[in-house]
Amino acid sequence: MIVGKVLDMDEKTAIIMTDDFAFLNVVRTSEMAVGKKVKVLDSDIIKPKNSLRRYLPVAAVAACFVIVLSFVLMFINGNTARKNIYAYVGIDINPSIELWINYNNKIAEAKALNGDAETVLEGLELKEKTVAEAVNEIVQKSMELGFISREKENIILISTACDLKAGEGSENKDVQNKIGQLFDDVNKAVSDLKNSGITTRILNLTLEERESSKEENISMGRYAVYLKAKEQNVNLTIDEIKDADLLELIAKVGIDNENVPEDIVTEDKDNLDAINTGPAESAVPEVTETLPATSTPGRTEGNTATGSVDSTPALSKNETPGKTETPGRTFNTPAKSSLGQSSTPKPVSPVQTATATKGIGTLTPRNSPTPVIPSTGIQWIDQANERINEIRKRNVQIKVVDSSNKPIENAYVEAVLTNHAFGFGTAITRRAMYDSNYTKFIKDHFNWAVFENESKWYTNEPSMGIITYDDADYLYEFCRSNGIKVRGHCIFWEAEEWQPAWVRSLDPFTLRFAVDNRLNSAVGHFKGKFEHWDVNNEMIHGNFFKSRLGESIWPYMFNRAREIDPNAKYFVNNNITTLKEADDCVALVNWLRSQGVRVDGVGVHGHFGDSVDRNLLKGILDKLSVLNLPIWITEYDSVTPDEYRRADNLENLYRTAFSHPSVEGIVMWGFWERVHWRGRDASIVNDNWTLNEAGRRFESLMNEWTTRAYGSTDGSGSFGFRGFYGTYRITVTVPGKGKYNYTLNLNRGSGTLQTTYRIP
C-alpha cells in the first residue's frame, strides 16, 4: 500500500506525491481530489506519462503548497488532540507498542513502533480502553501470532512516561491522583500477566528521556534498558539493544525493581522460580547470570553421530548420571531414512552428553581441572574445534526443586537442542516444491532459506508495471509455517546483465522513477517478513545504477529501504574469493558509512571451483571482521565431479566459517542435483534422493554441531551441561511424579546460565 497526496488529475489518471516526495502516475479513483491524501496499491501504478517530466516544475510548486498546508493542519489538529495526552505506556515483547493515555486514563491512541507491532495492532480497537484491557488484548493477539508462546520463556517490558505538569491550566488539577490511578491500572496488567506465567519488568522514564528514545528510533522500554546499562557500565550500544533478545538483555543488564515506584512490584520475590503449568506442559524458568568462577570451566561433553535417545529411563543410584560419550571422527553413512537418504535432524538437533555437577556455578569436570576436547588427530580441525567450543557454546546449570524449594535428587534431565542459534540455510526454488522429498529435506536440515530467483526484480516485474510476487509468497508461506527464517535476495543487482530487459532501456529520469517504485513495491510487500535484505547485489563488481544515476543512488537505496521496513537488516552482498575483493568490500562499507548509511551485515558469496582454500577463506573473514559487522556466507557451492573432493571443500568452508567469531550463518546455494544451478557436480543430494559424499559430510557436521545432554540430578538437585547456543527442549522426569517439559533459550553471554525448575 502506497500513501500520497493528489497533485493533479485527468479523466483516467492522477499524479500523486508520496511522503518521500516521489511522483507517481496512478489510476484515478472516485474518492480522489487534488490535495487529498489517498492510498493506492502497487497495481494502481501505471507507466509514467511523457508529460510527467514537464509537469515536475508545476508539481514542485503544488507540492510545496501541499506540504505547507499539511504542516498547518497537522499543527492545529495535533495540538488539539495532544493537549489531552499526559502519559505514555510502552509495551515491548518483540512487537513494540506505545499507548498514549488521556486524562481519563484511557487509551487515546496506540502506536506501532515496528512491523511486528503493526501486525499485532491490526484489527484491535484499543481506544477508550484501560491499560490493563489493552495489554490483555495485545498479549492475546501476540499469542495467536506466535510472538508469545507457552512453550518458551516469555518476558514483557512495560515502560511509562508521565507529564507531571500536564494538568496545569486545565480542568484536571489532580494530575498526581491520575498518575496513581494509572499505576494501579498498570499493576493490574502486571498481575494478570503474572497469573498467565509471563514475567514482567516495569521501568519509568521522564518525558525528556522518551523524546530521546524517539530521536534514537528505539522504544521507551529498550531505551530505559540502555540508560540502565550505561549506569552499570555494561558495554551495550543502542543498536545492540534494539536487536537483542529481551530475556537475555534484561538478564545481562540486571534489570530489577530499582527504577520502579514503590507501589509497583513486578514479581513476587519469594517466588522467582519457574512457574510450572503441570506435567508435560511448558513452564517459564527463572534465568540468571553468574560470572565465571576462577577455575577453568570444564568441557565434559562428547559428540556422537549415532542418533538420539527416544526414552528417558530412570537411573538407579548405582549408575553414573550423565556418562560422557566421545566417539572418534568418522564419516560413515548414517542410517537410511524413508527417502533413501541419511536421516538427520535439522541443524538443530545434536547428540551430546554431560556430567551432572555439584552446586550451582561453572561446570567442572569430575576428574580433571583442565578442558577436555577429543582430538581428531588432524591439527587444523582440532584448532577449529577449540574455537568452536569457545565461541559457540555456553555452560548451563539446571536445578530441580520441589514446591518447598527443596532440591530433588535423581531427577532425570534431558536437554535437546531443537533450533540452532547459528544460521544453516539453503537457496530454495518454487519449481521444485512439487516434490515432497525436496520440502522434507529443507524442513529436516535448515533453519534459514533464501529464494533463488523469486524475489529478484526480473522475476517480480518482467514487464514495466506488471508486478507479481506469487512464487515468492508461496515460498515464504512454506518457510513461515515451518519456522524457517528468510533472507531477501535481492532488491537490486548492480550488474547490467541481470536487470529486467525493460530496465536496461530506461533513460536516467525514468530509471530513477523505477528505482523508487521497486523499493516501495518489494520492500513494502515483504515488510515484516524478511529478516535480511541484500540491498544491491555485487556492488564491488558492477555499476549499472551508479553509472546512470550517480554514486548517491547507493546510499539512497539503503536509507529508503530502511524507511520502508525499519526492522529488516540490510546487507552488502558480494562475491569475495580473493583478499583484494575483501579489501574492496571493506572500502565499500566504509564509504557507505561516510554517507550516513547504516550497514547491518556483510554477505559473502562463495561460488568455488574444485577447491576451497581454508587459509585464504580465513584471511578473507579476518579482513572483513574489522568492520565489526555480522558476516554471512550467503551463497556457497563448489563444483567438481569428485564427490570426495566436494565433501572436503564443503568441510573446509563450513568448519572454517563456523569457527570464526564474526560469522553468524552459512547458506548453501541449493542441494538437489535436479535443480542445482551448477548441476550434478555441485550437489550434495543425488537425483534419486540418496546422499553423495558431500551430503554425508554435511550431515556429519550437522550431527557434530548439535547438543543432547542427559543425566540425573545430584544431591543438590543440580545437573549441568555445555551446549551450543539455541533453543532447547528440557524434559525433567521425577520418579513418582511424572514428566515435565520446558523450553530453554541458551543465548550468548558470559558465565553460566542458571535456571531452576520447580516441580509441584
UniProtKB/Swiss-Prot annotation:
It comes from Acetivibrio thermocellus (strain ATCC 27405 / DSM 1237 / JCM 9322 / NBRC 103400 / NCIMB 10682 / NRRL B-4536 / VPI 7372). Disulfide bonds: none annotated. GO terms for cellular component: plasma membrane. Its main location: membrane. Residues 2-49 form the RsgI N-terminal anti-sigma domain. Residues 1-55 are cytoplasmic. Keywords: Carbohydrate metabolism, Cell membrane, Glycosidase, Hydrolase, Membrane, Polysaccharide degradation, Transmembrane, Transmembrane helix, Xylan degradation. It is an enzyme of class 3 (hydrolase). This is Anti-sigma-I factor RsgI6. SMART domains: Glyco_10. PANTHER family: ENDO-1,4-BETA-XYLANASE 1 (PTHR31490:SF1), GLYCOSYL HYDROLASE (PTHR31490). The keyword Transmembrane applies. The chain crosses the membrane at residues 56-76. Gene3D superfamilies: Glycosidases. PROSITE patterns: GH10_2, RSGI_N. In the C-terminal section; belongs to the glycosyl hydrolase 10 (cellulase F) family. The GH10 domain binds to xylan. GO terms for biological process: xylan catabolic process. Residues 274-352 are annotated as: Disordered. It is found in: Cell membrane.
